[in-house]
Amino acid sequence: MKRSKELITKNHSQEETSILRCWKCRKCIASSGCFMEYLENQVIKDKDDSVDAQNICHVWHMNVEALPEWISCLIQKAQWTVGKLNCPFCGARLGGFNFVSTPKCSCGQLAAVHLSKSRTDYQPTQAGRLMRPSVKYLSHPRVQSGCDKEALLTGGGSENRNHRLLNMARNNNDPGRLTEALCLEVRPTYFEMKNEKLLSKASEPKYQLFVPQLVTGRCATRAFHRKSHSLDLNISEKLTLLPTLYEIHSKTTAYSRLNETQPIDLSGLPLQSSKNSYSFQNPSSFDPSMLLQRFSVAPHETQTQRGGEFQCGLEAASVYSDHTNTNNLTFLMDLPSAGRSMPEASDQEEHLSPLDFLHSANFSLGSINQRLNKRERSKLKNLRRKQRRRERWLQKQGKYSGVGLLDHMTLNNEMSTDEDNEYAEEKDSYICAVCLDVYFNPYMCYPCHHIFCEPCLRTLAKDNPSSTPCPLCRTIISRVFFQTELNNATKTFFTKEYLKIKQSFQKSNSAKWPLPSCRKAFHLFGGFRRHAAPVTRRQFPHGAHRMDYLHFEDDSRGWWFDMDMVIIYIYSVNWVIGFIVFCFLCYFFFPF
């Protein structure tokens, strides 16, 4: 009795506590115990009274003496000055604090620490009990009374829960909040049956074999109420979410694949039965009573073998229909069959899982896609790319003759879009970093190994060809190498653009400008090397050809020999030699 009183008191305190949730990640960030004393009157006034827009308070005023831990840490980190309050889970902006010059709210109160109402969701007290059920006492069913055991077996707790959900749905018509509240009640239980059919079957002699096993102490000691599992759990633990991201433009439905030997109670559910699969579709209008009726179906079956936990493989499919609402999402659920102790499978009742409420109108696939790691996303991307190539190849072979006109047009549009995307991706690897156009006569610069097209290099080396810096790394270009294979690939894949650049290059004067080249050490008096420089072989990017080249590292020995300077010197020496010869001839032929 003492524990039951404590449990009642604890549940009563939970019912009186309301919470605030982040508008983005839907995580609990604060409770009503952190608000100021007048906040309850403020909430009632905002809901019921028709006050002017200037007098309505748009923030939640927080009590400085009862702040949440994460807010206290942020305030202490800012040394009780000024700062912003961001969500500790997703980082979204929620409010702020100001202890330097405390601003005054429109309601007349000082907003030292406040949370914005537009960035938080206030959850009323009706849904407070759905947030975190008590596990301390419910995990030990052997201390419960007989009434509790009867309610446990007959599903009385499920009816009370449905009654609470119905009240919440009537008070709050937001389908997103109701769906979230329902998600918190998903538990992997071992056995839960409807009261009427269980009691009726218990009286029949052929069910006396397995009905007493449910009320024995051995089965009652098994953990019935487990910790609530939300949809925010890790995927590898309970839910295996495999979104099929292929775009399907035809009208499709989702099928819940069940075994052929499993009879299903479909009374009151809007399902369309087929041979061994059942399709369900979300209606356009939200009906809380229908949702609760679907949720009230007993979700589990009797199990006697070890390890027969009920598991759901939830495969989220991003399927959009052309004739239905775009918010209607479909899910594919695998319900694996558990072990049975009776030879007649039709004698045991099996029902749909309560997860079928997940195809609510406001459930998005963004959180599912974020769960996928980089490896899975790359695999999906590769599969889609291979499928598109296969479809293009089949289309070229003319094997789409049996496809309808509309499907063929849709397929052509899809493949044209995919081809454009792949064309853009392939073109990025053949674009020069200077002119941002495809390569025309590409050259690789040494020693930085950056590749540029010929017009760009000649333009850069116009003023100073002997000390031209690389436009990317600013390294002095000592020599350039022509890339034959890259040039041929560019000419093959981008013929029109290549020819256009070629015509413009031939018409311009840049073809007469020199390519960049650095001075080379010419050993006149430093002595020639007996051994040749080591010959190296490098694999250039973009699939360029291999090239054997000498070691052109800078060498301090010997004199620097510049070809341009040599030409200048030769011309100047010729004039000097000619002048000397002229003077010598004048001396002999015209003596004084």
From Swiss-Prot:
Phosphoserine: residues bearing it: S230
Database matches in SMART domains: RING
Zinc fingers typed RING-type, residue spans: 432-474
Pathway info: Protein modification; protein ubiquitination
This protein's record includes keyword Cytoplasm: no
Transmembrane segments: 565-585
UniProt xrefs under SUPFAM superfamilies: RING/U-box
Region spans: Interaction with ZIC2: 281-489
UniProt record, GO biological process: adult behavior; norepinephrine metabolic process; positive regulation of proteasomal ubiquitin-dependent protein catabolic process; positive regulation of protein ubiquitination; protein polyubiquitination; serotonin metabolic process
Sequence ranges on the Extracellular membrane side: 586-592
Subcellular location(s) per record: Endoplasmic reticulum membrane; Nucleus envelope
Catalytic activity, reaction form: S-ubiquitinyl-[E2 ubiquitin-conjugating enzyme]-L-cysteine + [acceptor protein]-L-lysine = [E2 ubiquitin-conjugating enzyme]-L-cysteine + N(6)-ubiquitinyl-[acceptor protein]-L-lysine
GO molecular function: ubiquitin conjugating enzyme binding; ubiquitin protein ligase activity; zinc ion binding
Enzyme class (EC, first level): transferase
Keyword Chaperone found: no
Cellular component terms per the entry's GO annotation: endoplasmic reticulum membrane; nuclear envelope
Domain comment (free text): The RING-type zinc finger domain mediates polyubiquitination of the interacting protein.
Subunit (UniProt): Interacts with ZIC2.
Function: E3 ubiquitin-protein ligase which promotes polyubiquitination and degradation by the proteasome pathway of ZIC2.
Protein name as it appears in the record: E3 ubiquitin-protein ligase RNF180
Species of provenance: Homo sapiens
GN (gene name): RNF180
